[in-house]
Structure formats: C-alpha cells, structure tokens
Amino acid sequence: MITITLTIPGAPRTKKNSGRIVHAGGLRLLPSKAWEQWANQVSPMLRAWALRNRLQPIASPVNCAALFYRDADRGDAVGFYQGLADVLEKAGIVENDKWIVSWDGSRLRKDASRPRVELALTATKE
C-alpha cells in the first residue's frame, strides 16, 4: 500500500468559521479570511514539494490521517478536514477532494509553540 507523508507548517485554519457573505449577483458564502491566508501560504509550498517529488495529483481513493496541531483549542474536526482537503486540491496533491474517502486516524491537538498539520495519505480500496 502506498503512503505519502508530509508536514505542513503553520497554524491550520477551518474554512467556514467566520465565513463572509457577499452580494455578487446573489448571495455567496466565501471562506474565512484566516483560511484564505493559510491556503495561500501553504499551497505554493505543497505544489513545489509535489513537483520535486514528481507526484501526479492523486485520482484514486485515499485515507487522510491528519494530526492538526492547532495554536489554540478552537474549531471543529469537520471544519479542519474540509479546509485541509480544499488546500490539498488547490495545491494539486489530490485531483479532487472527493478522492479523500476517509479520515481514519485524524485528531485535533494543540501545540501553540509549533502549530502544524502532519498527514499521511494512504491508498485504499474503497
């Protein structure tokens, strides 16, 4: 079974906490500014890592076991899962976040001195 492991430095952010509603031809809900800043910071790093390692975007079912080391005890697991999945798609690690079919082994933890996400993407037969 193939597993890809990596660490994303910096405080992970959820996508929907403090979401913004805009009126642009109708109502739209935008992701939180904190998530956008985090995504814009880590996506280029992840893209460069994928290029260095000649990784093609994942286009088959995987389990994402992610340890979210947060700077504070806030946010819910589902919000962190969604935020990470969208970052992995934006960076080209996964072709589409639909390929993340499970989050077995994921946990929310706190490490204010060194926030990060440690993750392992493992191929699955689901």
Located regions from the model:
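Acidic, proline/glycine-enriched N-terminal capping motif
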Residues: 1-126
